[in-house]
């Protein structure tokens, strides 16, 4: 009997030690399966944006339409207006540059927070996020421990810095977000008679009342996964970094969107272009009434994925990752150009 207990205990210890030794690989193998079970993604579902008055009616409302375009994780030097742009100035962003050249250029503008979600809260609310207690980007509860495991095995130079004391003191994931009592620009404009539409990333909380439609947007096409295209799509070129955090981003990525809180579905093209085309639909459908469009691009946040056609324009760059990164910026600039062109016709 003792010998049997000894063998069982030894086997369990061996299994535990193997699992611990290969915990990162096991996580990377299991997460996609669990995500697809918990969050199944349907094939593409067409959006149904609200429409304004018929084109044949004369527009008498002279209030300006407002389009707010937000890029994610773009560096200050990535556009050619600033010090020549990415890739030592060889990447040009003429459409983005034109906004500054023909309008206002805030050369000393700063974000109200150094992390993603709180800075977005400041844009929507017009307040410093510290004023309402939203100082850190929400991270799922279990991920706080998982991330600490991941970074332990990374190169010390590239390793993410994590303040465990702060991380462990944060509210639960479902409680984190911009408080529902905060008034957003969308709520103000909606109450003033504007049609309000959101496209892309939100990142301001998952609790009841924190979604875009509860915060002033009549329609919302929301980012629901971090992939720009499936990794094996023939039209996409991928670039990866040798860090466990990047591996986890790739592992946990889904190619998904959600319209007005409905089921998850696959976009029908490269996400930057998909959001752009949907923005053009909003403009076309609402050209005869005042509207506020918040086009919140996922680009150029990782994972690094660019269209092959864009990467092929970057062959003068020697670094593969830089080629892909630049291709993502080119797609973003193309998006801005399309919105500008259509807006000049209808606004």
Listing of model-derived features with the role each one plays in the protein:
Residues 1-4:
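Positively charged n-region of N-terminal signal peptides that target proteins for export
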Residues 7-20:
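Hydrophobic membrane-insertion alpha-helices, especially the h-region
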Residues 31-104:
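Active-site-proximal N-terminal segment of extracellular/periplasmic enzymes that hydrolyze or transfer
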Residues 87-120, 126-131, 193-197, 218-224:
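Short, structured active-site-proximal loop/turn typified by the sulfatase FGly-forming signature C/S-X-P-X-R
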Residues 139-195, 202-291, 297-306, 312:
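Formylglycine-dependent
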Residues 331-342:
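Active-site neighborhood of glycoside hydrolase catalytic domains
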Residues 345-347:
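Conserved small/polar residues in nucleotide/adenosyl-binding loops
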């Amino acid at each position: 009997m003792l010998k049997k207990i000894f063998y069982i205990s030894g086997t369990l210890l061996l299994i535990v030690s193997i699992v611990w030794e290969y915990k990162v690989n096991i996580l990377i193998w299991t997460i996609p399966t669990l995500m697809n079970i918990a969050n199944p993604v349907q094939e593409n579902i067409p959006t149904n944006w609200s429409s304004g008055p018929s084109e044949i009616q004369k527009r008498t409302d002279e209030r300006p339409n407002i389009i707010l375009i937000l890029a994610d994780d773009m560096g200050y030097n990535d556009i050619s207006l600033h010090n020549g742009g990415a890739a030592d100035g060889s990447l040009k962003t003429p459409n983005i540059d034109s906004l500054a050249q023909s309008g206002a250029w805030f050369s000393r503008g700063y974000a109200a927070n150094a992390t993603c979600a709180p800075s977005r809260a400041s844009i929507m609310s017009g307040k410093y996020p510290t004023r309402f207690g939203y100082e850190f980007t929400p991270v799922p509860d279990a991920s706080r421990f998982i991330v600490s495991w991941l970074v332990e095995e990374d190169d010390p130079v590239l390793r993410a810095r994590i303040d465990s004391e702060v991380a462990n003191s944060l509210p639960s994931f479902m409680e984190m977000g911009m408080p529902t009592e905060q008034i957003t620009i969308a709520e103000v404009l909606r109450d003033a008679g504007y049609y309000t539409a959101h496209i892309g990333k939100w990142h301001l909380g998952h609790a009841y009342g924190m979604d875009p439609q509860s915060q002033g947007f009549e329609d919302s096409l929301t980012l629901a996964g971090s992939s720009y295209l499936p990794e094996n799509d023939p039209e996409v070129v991928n670039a990866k970094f040798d860090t466990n955090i990047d591996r986890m981003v790739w592992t946990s990525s889904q190619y998904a969107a959600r319209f007005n809180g409905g089921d998850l579905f696959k976009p029908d093209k490269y996400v930057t272009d998909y959001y752009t085309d949907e923005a053009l639909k909003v403009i076309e459908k609402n050209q005869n009434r005042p509207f506020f469009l918040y086009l919140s691009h996922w680009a150029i946040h990782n994972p690094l994925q660019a269209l092959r056609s864009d990467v092929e324009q970057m062959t003068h760059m020697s670094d593969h990752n830089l080629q892909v990164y630049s291709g993502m910026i080119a797609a973003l600039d193309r998006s801005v150009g399309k919105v500008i062109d259509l807006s000049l016709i209808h606004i």
